[in-house]
Every structure is written in C-alpha cells, then in structure tokens.
C-alpha cells in the first residue's frame, strides 16, 4: 500500500537502503559528498548525455528497429559502476578494449560467483601500488575506471530488478495484462536508478557514475551503428 503511493525515486531509495542494511553499509542521512573538481576541458569531455542522431529525410523500406533491454541499468550492473568502485586505488585499468569476459554477468548469482573467483585468485595489489588488471574497466573517452575487486553497490541493487523484469516479460500474454503492468513498473524503477546517480540529493548518487554510464551508452550505440 505504501509503495503504490510513492514516487519511483522514493521506491528506489528504499530498495537501496534495504540492500545497504543487509550488506552492513552505512546509509548517509544526507548526501555530503561534493562533485570532484574538473578543468574546463574535462567538463567538456565528461558532461555529456546520450547519443542522438538525426535521420536523413526520405522514404525507406525494409526498416529495422533495434531496441536495447534496460540499457542503462544493464550498464550499471555489467560495467560495475557504483560510487565506491570509480577510480579505486587498488586497480589500474589496461588501455586495450575489454573482452566480453571482463564484464560482470547480469545474473546476480553469476556476478557473485565472478567476484568470489577474482578474490580466490588474489590477483590484486595493495592500494599503495595498484596493479594493471584487465577486469578493471576503463570508461570509454574518460579518465575513469571501475574496480575489479569490489562488487558495486548499485549493480547489486539493479541486477535483481532486471532479472525479475525479464521474467515478467516472458509471462506477458498481451499488452496491458497484469504481467505487463508489473514489468512496466520495474522499468521505471530501473530508469530512476540511473537518473539518481546524477541527482544532487540522492544518498548514493555520484555525478561521476552518471557520466560513466552515459559514456558506456555512447560507446555501445556507436559500436552498434558501425
């Protein structure tokens, strides 16, 4: 009853706080982390949105529409983007473009297994001497990388929602049925989770995470176009 009367932002904040309490993470009363300083050139390179292309006027046939399922939330989970994973002191990203194996599995259980396996191999250096690691993903076009050792908090929030939404879409029989309505509600929660990374008052927001998500989205779309 309470959830049905809350905004998507309030719901996603409640989910984040629940996961934080389950994992023993301190929940800030109010956000008190200022945005990192940037030069004018850095701001020009990072403070960008998604990718928009103007279509060429004309009449076309055999047109194909390509849609991504939960693109931005999937980027959060598979690229391990979270406030605490950005530019960690223990990892140094490689300059080469990462293989698919370097991404975190979207399935929550598979993601947990991946990080347990990385910890078992003990391939990480100390925070004083960071080591080059292929799993520490370099954000395309930015001077930012994500940690290969720590499983990001935001990824652990969105991955179960993505999985549940995919299950509901598989059960949908027609547009507007109960399963369609439920998956659509989860869709807006996932969209809000992305937006909250750049919201100045979000407890677990960080503008650098928002910029990293947008950078990966632009890279994926440009790769698809090519």
Model region roles, listed by residue range:
Residues 1-83, 89-90, 180-219:
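Common nucleic-acid-contacting/processivity interface regions adjacent to the catalytic cores
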Residues 68-71, 77, 81-82, 90-226:
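Conserved catalytic core of nucleic-acid polymerases
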